[in-house]
Amino acid sequence: MPEIKLTHVTKRWGKFYAVDDLSLDMEDNSFITLLGPSGCGKTTTLRMIAGLETPTSGQIKIGDRVVFDSEAGINVPANKRKVGFLFQNYALWPNMTVYQNISFGLGNIKEELPVIDEEAKALKSMIKALENPGELVKLIEECRDKKGKLDLDMVYLKLIDNYTISIYTAKELYNYKLHEAADKESTSKQKKQELTAKLDSILAGHKEKREELNEKFEVVSGGKVVTRVRKYSKEEIDLAVRRVSRIVKIGMFMNRYPAELSGGQQQRVAIARTLAPEP
């Protein structure tokens, strides 16, 4: 989270001052605890930062951006502030799986975003995985149960976590059936050559348009990253969900419902959902 700065922030309901002339600096990447008795304004302050409550007066700045200024008439809505807010009761949707709870908000975001060549990004990830066929096969074989049957959910999770890829790329990588090949080295080499040729063709296509891809696989034209107003793709949403699930260690619970989780596990899901927008 970038630096957050509150300057002379006041929140008043009638004659009651929930927050009175508060000035506060929160440094970039710092961990801040607001300590005080019930009713002193802790939650109100957090809600004002997130945009869920409108201050009576003052200024709130997140990073280099002023998100509220009473004198200038600025009040950026909550969904444009990129601030995660973890409610005290977790507020998980009981009818949604863990995956759906985390991804739900991401699917509603629509803003100016870089144009990304997702196919090229996935191809590069698979090529990298195929550079070490022994490691790839080992990861898959580790997912057999006592009867020798592969647990596909575990296979996908291992591939996702080890290669930092989406579920879609993990499934495609598994479907190459490298673990079943008689000559794994030759099969891996052949598949790698096919994918490399496909990637080269994509890069050549960008070159014809006088474009290139940067290290994030964002399309660059004229030295600038190309952007457009759009929603996150399924690939981007899945990568975001997998990223935060690794942080809080809930990757194995993606298909479960909140009622099937312990209180601590539900808390992790709520934290993951808060982190997913990547403020």
PLM features: what roles do these ranges have?
Residues 67-84, 108, 115-117, 127, ...:
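ABC ATPase NBD coupling module
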